[in-house]
């Protein structure tokens, strides 16, 4: 009987943290880097039915010849004004192709650490991979993961 009571109690908490799937793809050339650190994206990510209308972040890198690690901190502003905060790590590897062109591939892991409004208790993990062309300042990425709202 004690075991049944423990299971009943723990199952209620599990339902309170329903997890949601996340997937986002930025086709090649839709993200641009500039001196003003503005980003243009084709398809906007969606969280709980709301689109991200702006993503501002800081990336601190330790690259040598385009390869190395970086830390990212981002504030995503949703279409209703709510915000989602993230912290991530990036590992980049730059190689030179047979045509002499430099190509940088990367993988990333991002933690959703909190938010405002309806996203105040958001938590989650996203994994991404993609490429960057530092000469043209373009990037493409595929990101997947899951998030939930803690009660």
PLM regions: where:
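Bacterial N-terminal signal peptides
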Residues: 1-10
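Beta-strand-enriched cores of mature, soluble protein domains
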Residues: 14-151
